[in-house]
Amino acid sequence: MGARECPARLLLLSLLLLPLGLPVLGAPPRLICDSRVLERYILEAKEGENATMGCAESCSFSENITVPDTKVNFYAWKRMEVQQQAMEVWQGLALLSEAILQGQALLANSSQPSEALQLHVDKAVSGLRSLTSLLRALGAQKEAIPLPDASPSSATPLRTFAVDTLCKLFRNYSNFLRGKLTLYTGEACRRRDR
């Protein structure tokens, strides 16, 4: 293989692989509105939780990881401004992404990381990146920006707590997707249909 052929083949390979990322990166806003899409991510999170339920020592973290509180007061949620809902979901997703990445690093540094556990964590990292892109396409990031006339004191800080095991991290991930993310995307999709 000559020196000139190698860059040409790399370019060709890049062009062939480029479309693999396009369905998520250039995702239409309607994709997240298809309940099957969100259900797939919820199922992956639940599978991760189930896979980690049986392990004890190997699934404990050497330090606590901060995650978003997933409890939802439905009465208060329905009365929240769209921007506040978007902010809570966007901040929660960002914190959850950081938590999963931190869990991934702690798992990789553990004495004997299981390949199966590593696979579930890797799926969660990938899933959160995809969900972030889908929410961005839906406009959640723009909605999460506070209005100029909104007072800084009106924004409530994101409630958080700490987890110390991989199972609790996956449970939080699953609950966040089933709760706040599902509520927000459902309402955002209904607004888009109007």
From Swiss-Prot:
Keyword Ribonucleoprotein: no
InterPro entries: 4_helix_cytokine-like_core, EPO/TPO_CS, EPO_TPO, Erythroptn
Glycan-linked positions: 50, 64, 109, 172
Compartment annotation: Secreted
Main location: secreted
KW Signal (keyword) present: yes
Tissue spec. comment: Produced by kidney or liver of adult mammals and by liver of fetal or neonatal mammals.
Functional summary from the UniProt entry: Hormone involved in the regulation of erythrocyte proliferation and differentiation and the maintenance of a physiological level of circulating erythrocyte mass. Binds to EPOR leading to EPOR dimerization and JAK2 activation thereby activating specific downstream effectors, including STAT1 and STAT3.
Protein name: Erythropoietin
Organism, as annotated: Sus scrofa
